[in-house]
Amino acid sequence: MKLSRLALLSVFALASAPSWAESVVTVYSIDGLHDGDNSWYQVQFDAFTKATGITVRYVEGGGGVVVERLAKERTNPQADVLVTAPPFIQRAAAEKLLANFNTDAASAIPDANNLYSPLVKNYLSFIYNSKLLKTAPASWQDLLDGKFKNKLQYSTPGQAADGTAVMLQAFHSFGSKDAGFAYLGKLQANNVGPSASTGKLTALVNKGEIYVANGDLQMNLAQMERNPNVKIFWPANDKGERSALAIPYVIGLVQGAPQSENGKKLINFLLSKEAQTRVSELSWGMPVRSDVTPSDEHYKAATAALEGVQSWQPNWDDVAVSLSADISRWHKVTESE
């Protein structure tokens, strides 16, 4: 999920759509599912427009950025649907930016509730340049090696969902916040500096400008076709254990949405069996429905990549409560205030 500047993309009705296709639905989304031609979003938006006559207007930004935009528009909402990632979806719920809505697929989706639902499974990952490094860094300690000075970069916690995930993963891998922050303080000696975008780091790794960066599994798998020098890895802790934070795409209905009914229709459409079955084929993601198991090669590759890696997730509500304080502490320990 790279963090790009907000960009407005209008996905217009197909030529074959009915003449009554004047209604719209506006989506504020973290990116990653609209990358490249024939993406999952593009295919589903086109199919939705054809089926309903409703045009999809798409606004893209970082996980925290799209929520901040919703907050600024609280008195005059412009969006109908929000797609972001934890802990930003929990922040949106806590700030009462989301409306109550139980989706048609709720019973088939673990962790769905009356305010938001997982949309696509995803996981924190790391990438390295396999042309310049014979093997991936085996452990977190390896990343402190001097050879990575100014050759390592991760996106900024608080701005990018993936960057926030790096901070949380450090807490988990080192056993506590204190130990995680201590490590990130040391790692800063090798870090190139802040990056508002996770996705742009992939090209830098591919070109060898940096050797290592953070990312997420869905995005990195999709990008590897265009970036042949990039490979995925997960560093091990001092016990030799590799783990990956689960950071799903999550969808919710915006409180006070101008086209609330259209928003509900789109959410149900994206969570349908038909749409979920194609998310790996088109965008390398994994479906969230318990009754959908794709058989395409992308799905097989994604599941194979996670072999030997333990997935985990924190109590996201607790993370959302302490996020501002944790981000402030991150800036302090990395001297990036």
From Swiss-Prot:
It holds the Pfam family SBP_bac_1. The gene is phnS. The keyword Signal applies. This is Putative 2-aminoethylphosphonate-binding periplasmic protein. Transmembrane segments: none annotated. One of its GO terms (biological process) is thiamine transport. Belongs to the bacterial solute-binding protein 1 family. NCBIfam families: PhnS, PRK15046.1.
